[in-house]
C-alpha cells in the first residue's frame, strides 16, 4: 500500500488518530480518538477529487442518500473526539460514519448521491450548536449576535427593553408569551420562553405555562420568598417544566438554607450560582452541592480576571435599577461582588461541580461570548492547575469534553430539550457549527441550523469569488422565509401544545414540548456532576469544597481575546 506522511495527510484530509489539534490560541490540545474513514478511501469534493459521478458519488436516488454530507470533520462533543463524515437528512443528523459510493468502496455507511450537497469539513472542528439558557430578551439583535458566536438555542424571558426585562428573565402573562412566540418566527434560532414564577398562589402560573412558556423563572426583584419558591415548583411538577431561580441576595425572606429547604428536593436550575449575578450573599455557592440543584454560571465572571470585580459594580447598578446616590443600593451591589467566590467558581467548573455556562445577555452578561468564555475558563484552569487526572500532558480531551458539555448537552438536559438538541448525535436536529482550529470558540466558519446554512462569514457579494473583503457575518438562505421557520423550533410546555397554541397563535414553525424536566438531577449533568460539601466563611468569604480551600489568582492575560477582535 502507498504511504503518505502524517503532515501531508492532515493537510489533505484533516487530522487522524493520534494527531493533536490546538484550540485557538489556548493551551488546550485535543487528540483524535477514532477515525471512521478507511485509509485510501477518503472522500473529498473538488476538481479532480473523489466525489464525482461513478467515483465517490453513486447513482442512488435522493430518497436513499443524505441531503448534505460534511466530510472528514473532527467532531468535538461530550461523548468523544472523533474524525468522521456526517450525513444530514430532512434537517436532522442521519449518520456519523464513512461517506462514499458503496458500489466501488468498502465500509461505506453514508451513500453520496446526485442529490447530496457537500460541506468540506477537512481540517475543521464540528460541534453541536450552543445552548444559552439565561437570556434576557431585551433586543432582537441579540439573536444574530448569539448565532454568529455558535449558539443555536436561546432560553430565557423578556418582552424587549422593559424595565422588568432589563433585570429579570421573565416573559410575564399569556399576551406577552404569545407575542414573543410570534416574533420568534422571524429568527433562525430555537427559542423557549420562561414565564414569571413569582407568586404564592398557582392560578396565574398555570395560565402562563398553558399559554406557551417552557418553564418558570423566580427572580429576587419580583420577590423570591420561600412561599413563591414552593408554589412555583409545585406548578412545575404538575406540568413537567423547569424552574430557574435567582435567589434572595439580601437574605430578606430567609438565608440560603431556607431557600434550599423550600426546594423540598425538587429539581431547580440555579442561575449564576456563584452569586455575583445575584443570590444569597455570601454563600449561594453552597447550592452546587445538592443533588436537586442544577448549577450554572453566567459569563461575566468567566473566568476570574484582574478586571472582573471592578466591571461588575457598574454593571449591577444599571441592570437592577439601582441608584448610586442611595447608600442601601450601593451596599446591595457591594454585597454581591466577592473576589473569593468568583475565584472558587473557576475551580468548581474545573472539578465539574458547576454544570452549565450561559450569558445573562445585556443584564450583566454578553450574549456573544458564552462559547469563548467557557474555553477561556478551561484554558485558565489548565495553566493554573495543570492537566486533569483523566488527561495527560499530551492532550486535554477529558477537560475539553467537560467544558463543551457546559453549553451543549447539560442545558439541554436541564430544560427538557435534549431529545432535540444539545449534541452531535443521530436523530437530533442538525444544529451544527464548523470551526477552523485557529478560530475555535471565537469565530465560526459555518453555522448550520436544522440542516440549512443559516449564517457564515462572507465577503463582498459583488466580488468574483466569496472571499474578498469586507468579510463579515451575514445571514444565509437558511435564515429567510419559510426555510427559517422550517429549520428552527420553539420549545413550549406539553400543556400548551395540547391546548393548540400553534393554531390559535397562527404559528408556522414547529413547536416541541419539553419533557423529563422534573426527573433530571445533578447526577445527570454529563461530566459535571460532582456534589461537594460546600462551606463559605461569612467573614472572609473563603470557599471550601469537601474541606479543600478553593482559591486561584486572577488572569492578567487571556487567549481568544484581543488577538481576534478589533473592539
Swiss-Prot record:
Keywords: Cytoplasm, Hydrolase, Metal-binding, Nickel. Substrate binds at residue 219. This is Urease subunit alpha. The gene is ureC. Ni(2+) 2 binds at residues 217, 246, 272. Residues 129-567 form the Urease domain. Ni(2+) 1 binds at residues 134, 136, 217, 360. GO terms for biological process: urea catabolic process. PROSITE patterns: UREASE_1, UREASE_2, UREASE_3. Its main location: cytoplasm. Its EC number is 3.5.1.5. Belongs to the metallo-dependent hydrolases superfamily. Urease alpha subunit family. Its cofactor is Ni cation. Pathway: Nitrogen metabolism; urea degradation; CO(2) and NH(3) from urea (urease route): step 1/1. It catalyses: urea + 2 H2O + H(+) = hydrogencarbonate + 2 NH4(+). GO terms for cellular component: cytoplasm. The active site is at residue 320. Carboxylation allows a single lysine to coordinate two nickel ions. It comes from Teredinibacter turnerae (strain ATCC 39867 / T7901). Heterotrimer of UreA (gamma), UreB (beta) and UreC (alpha) subunits. Three heterotrimers associate to form the active enzyme. Gene3D superfamilies: Metal-dependent hydrolases, Urease, subunit C, domain 1. It is found in: Cytoplasm. It is an enzyme of class 3 (hydrolase).
Amino acid at each position: 500500500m502507498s504511504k503518505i506522511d502524517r503532515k501531508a495527510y492532515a493537510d489533505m484530509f484533516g487530522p487522524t488518530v493520534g494527531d493533536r489539534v490546538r484550540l485557538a490560541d489556548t493551551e488546550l490540545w485535543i487528540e483524535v480518538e477514532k477515525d471512521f474513514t478507511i485509509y485510501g478511501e477518503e472522500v473529498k469534493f473538488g476538481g479532480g477529487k473523489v466525489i464525482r459521478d461513478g467515483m465517490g458519488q453513486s447513482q442512488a436516488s435522493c430518497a436513499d442518500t443524505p441531503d448534505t454530507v460534511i466530510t472528514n470533520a473532527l467532531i468535538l462533543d461530550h461523548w468523544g473526539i472523533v474524525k468522521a463524515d456526517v450525513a444530514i437528512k430532512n434537517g436532522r443528523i442521519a449518520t456519523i460514519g464513512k461517506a462514499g459510493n458503496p458500489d466501488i468502496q468498502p465500509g461505506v455507511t453514508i451513500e453520496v448521491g446526485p442529490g447530496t450537497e457537500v460541506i468540506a469539513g477537512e481540517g475543521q472542528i464540528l460541534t453541536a450548536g450552543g445552548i444559552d439558557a439565561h437570556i434576557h430578551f431585551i433586543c432582537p439583535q441579540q439573536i444574530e449576535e448569539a448565532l454568529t458566536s455558535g449558539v443555536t438555542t436561546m432560553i430565557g424571558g423578556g418582552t424587549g427593553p422593559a424595565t422588568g426585562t432589563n433585570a429579570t428573565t421573565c416573559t410575564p402573562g399569556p399576551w406577552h408569551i404569545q407575542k414573543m412566540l410570534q416574533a420568534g418566527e422571524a429568527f433562525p434560532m430555537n427559542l423557549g420562553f420562561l414565564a414569571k414564577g413569582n407568586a404564592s398562589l398557582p392560578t396565574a402560573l398555570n395560565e402562563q405555562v398553558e399559554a406557551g412558556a417552557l418553564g418558570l423563572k423566580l427572580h429576587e426583584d419580583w420577590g423570591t420568598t420561600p412561599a413563591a419558591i414552593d408554589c412555583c415548583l409545585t406548578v412545575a411538577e404538575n406540568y413537567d417544566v423547569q424552574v430557574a431561580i435567582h435567589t434572595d441576595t439580601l437574605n430578606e425572606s430567609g438565608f440560603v438554607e431556607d431557600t434550599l429547604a423550600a426546594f423540598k428536593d425538587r429539581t431547580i436550575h440555579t442561575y449564576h450560582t456563584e452569586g455575583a449575578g445575584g443570590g444569597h450573599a455570601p454563600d449561594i455557592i453552597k447550592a452546587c452541592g445538592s443533588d436537586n440543584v442544577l448549577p450554572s454560571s453566567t459569563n461575566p465572571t468567566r473566568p476570574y480576571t484582574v478586571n472582573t470585580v471592578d466591571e461588575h459594580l457598574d454593571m449591577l447598578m444599571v441592570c437592577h435599577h439601582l441608584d448610586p446616590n442611595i447608600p442601601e443600593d450601593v451596599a446591595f451591589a457591594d454585597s454581591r461582588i466577592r473576589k473569593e467566590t468568583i475565584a472558587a467558581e473557576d475551580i468548581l467548573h474545573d472539578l465539574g461541580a458547576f454544570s452549565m455556562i450561559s450569558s445573562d445577555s445585556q443584564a450583566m452578561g454578553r450574549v456573544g461570548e458564552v462559547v469563548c468564555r467557557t474555553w477561556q475558563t478551561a484554558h485558565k484552569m489548565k495553566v493554573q492547575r495543570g492537566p486533569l487526572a483523566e488527561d495527560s500532558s499530551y492532550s486535554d480531551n477529558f477537560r475539553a469534553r467537560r467544558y463543551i458539555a457546559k453549553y451543549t448537552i447539560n442545558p439541554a438536559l436541564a430544560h427538557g430539550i435534549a431529545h432535540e438538541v444539545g449534541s452531535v448525535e443521530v436523530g437530533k436536529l442538525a444544529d451544527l457549527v464548523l470551526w477552523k482550529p485557529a478560530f475555535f470558540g471565537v469565530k465560526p466558519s459555518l453555522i448550520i441550523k436544522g440542516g440549512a446554512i443559516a449564517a457564515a462569514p462572507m465577503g463582498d457579494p459583488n466580488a468574483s469569488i466569496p472571499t474578498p473583503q469586507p468579510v463579515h457575518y451575514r445571514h444565509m438562505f437558511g435564515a429567510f422565509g419559510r426555510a427559517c421557520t422550517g429549520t428552527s423550533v420553539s420549545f413550549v410546555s406539553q400543556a400548551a401544545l395540547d391546548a393548540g397554541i400553534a393554531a390559535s397563535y397562527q404559528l408556522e414553525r414547529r413547536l416541541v414540548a419539553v419533557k423529563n424536566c422534573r426527573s433530571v438531577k445533578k447526577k445527570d449533568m454529563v461530566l459535571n456532576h460532582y456534589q461537594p460539601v460546600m462551606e463559605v466563611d461569612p467573614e472572609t468569604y473563603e470557599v471550601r469544597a469537601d474541606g479543600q480551600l478553593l482559591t486561584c489568582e486572577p488572569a492578567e492575560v487571556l487567549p481568544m481575546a484581543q488577538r481576534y477582535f478589533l473592539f
